[in-house]
Amino acid sequence: MIGGTRSPKVSVVVPTHDSGPHIEKLVASLLRQSLPAAEFEAVFVDDGSTDGTPARLAELAAAHPHFRVLRIENSGWPSRPRNLGVAHARGEYVLFADDDDWLGDEALERLHDCARTHDADVVVGRMAGHGRSVPRELFRRNRFDATLANSPLIDSLTCHKMFRRAFLDEHGLRFPEGPLRRLEDHRMVVRSYFLSRRTCVLSDYTCYHHARRGDAGNVTATRLDPAEYYASLREALDIVDAHTEPGPLRDRLHRRWLRNEMLNRVRGRRMLDAPEEWLAQVVREIQGVIRERFAPGVAAGLPPLQRVLAHLAEQGRVADLRRLAEWETGVRAAGTVDRHEVAGTALTVTVSARLESAGRPVTFAADGDRDLLVLPVDDLDPVLRDMTAALGRSRLDVVARRRETSEEVLLPVTSDTRWVPGPAGERHLVHHAVATVDGAALDAGTWSLKARVTCAGWTEDTRLPLVLRPAGDGAAPAVEDERALWTRLRRAVRRRIGRR
């Protein structure tokens, strides 16, 4: 109870710095929360803003008793404001939010209910990305006893979660404030996963909207210093090593940083747009981490494209990385709707999809009983390009995406993957899936369908021509086939031209 004797259920801790109008979505979402205002507080910690942010926060605190504002001299990074927010928080649970993100309207109520129902120390709510990538596989289903060993929990290392405040205090879990500032949330969150008595993943509601500011104005959007960044990454690896023994689990956890923070920086458009001198520094740092910190099983467990990237980076072959990046910019998923039917409120759709490069299928060459990914780089050990182990992890998902909010729902599918021979002895993979969606269970809005191909080291989306428009009242949704719309438009254009 704010201003009374009872502590609030939740404290939302928000670091701010020159937030400007970007904070308004978060503020509006806090004011829309289904959890009563008397049962939560928002603790804004302003990190030395030089614009109108302090005045706006003071205005909000004056109007809303459950909003509190603290001001500090500029520290230059979110760690200190977050830590100060925790020190002043009064809630049973703490949720960290950034000033340019926002919450789902029922986020606090649902996350707190989940935490109390399952006596959880940590609750991870489903996220939607707006110009930012967010975990996907983790949110395929609810998980009420998730661990780093039994789930892809390691895919979610941002701090935008709900933590039991007593748990944070018991273990001294705070964000590092030392000279190594990058990946501060990784180091705090991965420790919390190891120490948590129970961690839940709430996947049936979009709790958090993670956005990239159009002006790239927040501090984490600045170009990283490679030496500082990878020194911070090494500290995250130290935490993993302190809680695991050498072996498959440690390799799998290390693999997350190799894949996301290392290889993703030296592939595709991201690499081609980077300054050459800076990129050379990044590759040198990656090379050092791979050689000094990773067991052979870390890279060996990757799919073939990423194994090749790891090998090229470890060898310092920047020219070959660039050649591969130029080719990879042409890789896309191509999908078709083979059939669809509506029965009652349910839509069943049959989809086929494959990976293409410049309009031609991504191919594999036979090598005895192996199929090797064909890449535009020479002098590669066939083991690096071998698709055998990764074939079972290839799949086709069908995703419903709400246009108004960018939230995504992975639909239940039955799927299979088949080899298709080519004219010159090569072959490629075609993925098939049958998905069913109950339109009556979707929130009101416009939902697009897309196919998501995961294969050989790529995860690529392609839009499908079906759109659902549920009203949110439990009735059957309208289903539009955009192919039919375009056919009608083409016919209308031809008729109009024919009259001239």
Language-model features: where?
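Nucleotide-sugar donor-binding/catalytic module of glycosyltransferases
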Residues: 1-232
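Catalytic core of nucleotide-sugar-dependent glycosyltransferases
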Residues: 205-213, 219-247, 261-262, 272-292
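Amphipathic alpha-helical repeat scaffolds of TPR domains
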Residues: 255-265
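Basic, ligand-binding patches in group-transfer machinery
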Residues: 2, 7, 267-500
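Hydrophobic, Leu/Ile/Phe/Ala-enriched alpha-helical segments that form helix-helix packing faces
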Residues: 30, 34, 61, 236-240, ...
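Long, charge-rich alpha-helical interaction segments
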Residues: 251-252
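Short glycine/serine- and small hydrophobic-enriched flexible loop segments
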Residues: 194, 238, 264-268
